[in-house]
Amino acid sequence: MSNQEYIHQAEHRISVVINTYNASQHLAEVLETVKDFDEVVICDMESTDNTLDIARKYGCKIVIFPRGNYQICEPARQTAIDAASCKWVLVVDADELVTPELKQYLYSLIGKEDAPQGLYVPRKSRFMGRFMHCFYPDYQLRFFIRKDTVWPAIIHADPVIKGRIEKIPAAHADMPLDHLADNSIASRMGKINQYTANEIEKKKDRNYGMAALFYRPFVRFFRAYIQKGGFRDGKEGFICACYEGIYQFVAVSKIIEDRMKKRK
């Protein structure tokens, strides 16, 4: 192989990066869908189940990130990305499946001279046992050039990417990540406090008042139930849309509370 051919090959390689902690429930199924990528990196936060045994079975590259008191995976994202050796990185959660069509699309994309430096990938999610239209396309910024990307250690943070970012059109129904987690009402309500706490930092400069407590939850509900088609999902869709409104109400309330505390 000539030096030019080697460089060309290196430019068209993809590392799949997965952060794990006690992820044995779905990990084997996930790894089956990504095993044919150029590299699979598992960044584990000291799992106590057989997560690492599964990763070794599939020949994954394994790095360990000390869990400490962390309850989220974001602090370990950058460690996982840095452990990858390929130019391009696809970040996949330990409960997300990658379709053959998505894989083909990504390899085709990086072969183009005008390929973007980052790509939003749509994701299908479940609630109360069924796919939810009100969540879709739930875009995730998961594909990018490794050396041009930094991932903040903040819950639900998007990576910071140097360069142009594009989206896979939501109409490509065969390309979304398939999120296996089947969220129940209890699990989603249990996450509200954790997730909305992050909204305080993200939106600390927003001057929300009483009006925002009314219109923001309503807009969130309307978008989920009407605009995104939650009405097609029956009672589950209505409950899901209500949850979206409740989430927004709690988030705005916390932002207002934080501002009031700082004024005292």
Segment roles from a protein language model:
Residues 13-15, 39:
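Cell-envelope/extracellular polymer assembly enzymes that use nucleotide-activated donors
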Residues 52-85:
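Conserved donor nucleotide-binding strand/loop of the catalytic core
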Residues 33, 44-53:
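A conserved acidic beta->alpha catalytic loop
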Residues 89:
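Short aromatic/hydrophobic "clamp" motif used to bind/position activated sugar donors
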Residues 25-28, 49-58, 101-102:
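Acidic helix N-cap motif at the loop->helix transition within catalytic regions
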Residues 36, 57-59, 139:
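Short, structured coil segments at secondary-structure junctions
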Residues 74-75, 81, 92, 99-262:
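Catalytic-site signature of metal-activated, phosphate-bearing donor transferases
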Residues 17-36:
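Short, well-formed alpha-helical segments that are part of the catalytic scaffolds
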